[in-house]
């Protein structure tokens, strides 16, 4: 298992609320919590930036982290990430923040300490551009947006 440096920025994290952890041995994501001063009501269409009380330092340029929505919040309540996916670079050291967007039709209360997103480590391959005049020909070519067939 990879070690991930973390700093607790909100003293309630690890005391009143558990530190992020994997729920099962097969879990891919660590749950991030809303470390708010008070519960907030997210109105339909509203987006709010929510602190997690945690900063991380990945340090390995071969890794990055992604902040992803929790499936239950999106499916049951219409609460998704305002930026859809948060990408955390390996050299970032600031607080993890979660942009929550209520795409539903009813107000939703986010409680202090509620699990609002998940953090997943992913491998990164950095590439450089090799400028060419033409690409090698392929069957697909430049076709996109449904070009490979329907269902």
From Swiss-Prot:
Pathway(s) per entry:
Pyrimidine metabolism; dUMP biosynthesis; dUMP from dCTP (dUTP route): step 2/2
Q: Which Gene3D superfamilies match?
A: 2.70.40.10
Q: What does the UniProt keyword field contain?
A: Hydrolase, Magnesium, Metal-binding, Nucleotide metabolism
Kindly state which reaction or reactions the protein catalyses: dUTP + H2O = dUMP + diphosphate + H(+)
Q: Which GO terms describe its molecular function?
A: dUTP diphosphatase activity; magnesium ion binding
Q: What's the Enzyme Commission number for this chain? A: 3.6.1.23
Q: Which InterPro entries match?
A: dUTPase, dUTPase-like, dUTPase-like_sf, dUTPase_trimeric
Q: Which residues are listed for substrate binding in this entry?
A: 70-72, 83, 87-89, 97
Kindly give the Pfam families that the UniProt entry links to this protein.
dUTPase
The EC class name is hydrolase
- The superkingdom listed in its UniProt entry is Bacteria
GO BP terms: dUMP biosynthetic process; dUTP catabolic process
Q: Which cofactor does it need?
A: Mg(2+)
Membership in a protein family: Belongs to the dUTPase family.
Tell me which NCBIfam families the record gives: dut (TIGR00576), PRK00601.1 (NF001862)
What is the protein's known function?
Answer: This enzyme is involved in nucleotide metabolism: it produces dUMP, the immediate precursor of thymidine nucleotides and it decreases the intracellular concentration of dUTP so that uracil cannot be incorporated into DNA.
Q: What is this protein called?
A: Deoxyuridine 5'-triphosphate nucleotidohydrolase
Gene that produces this protein: dut
């Amino acid at each position: 298992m990879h070690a991930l440096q973390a700093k607790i920025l909100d003293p309630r994290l690890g005391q009143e609320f558990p530190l992020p952890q994997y729920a099962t041995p097969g879990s891919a994501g660590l749950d991030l919590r809303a470390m708010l001063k008070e519960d907030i009501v997210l109105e339909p269409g509203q987006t709010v930036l929510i602190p997690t009380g945690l900063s991380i330092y990945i340090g390995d340029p071969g890794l990055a982290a992604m902040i992803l929505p929790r499936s239950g919040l999106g499916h049951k309540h219409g609460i998704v990430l305002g930026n859809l996916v948060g990408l955390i670079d390996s050299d970032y050291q600031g607080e993890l923040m979660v942009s929550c967007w209520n795409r539903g039709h009813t107000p939703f209360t986010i409680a202090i300490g509620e699990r609002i997103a998940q953090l997943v480590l992913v491998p990164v391959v950095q590439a450089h551009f090799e400028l060419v005049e033409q690409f090698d020909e392929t069957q697909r070519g430049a076709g996109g947006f449904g070009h490979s067939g329907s269902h």
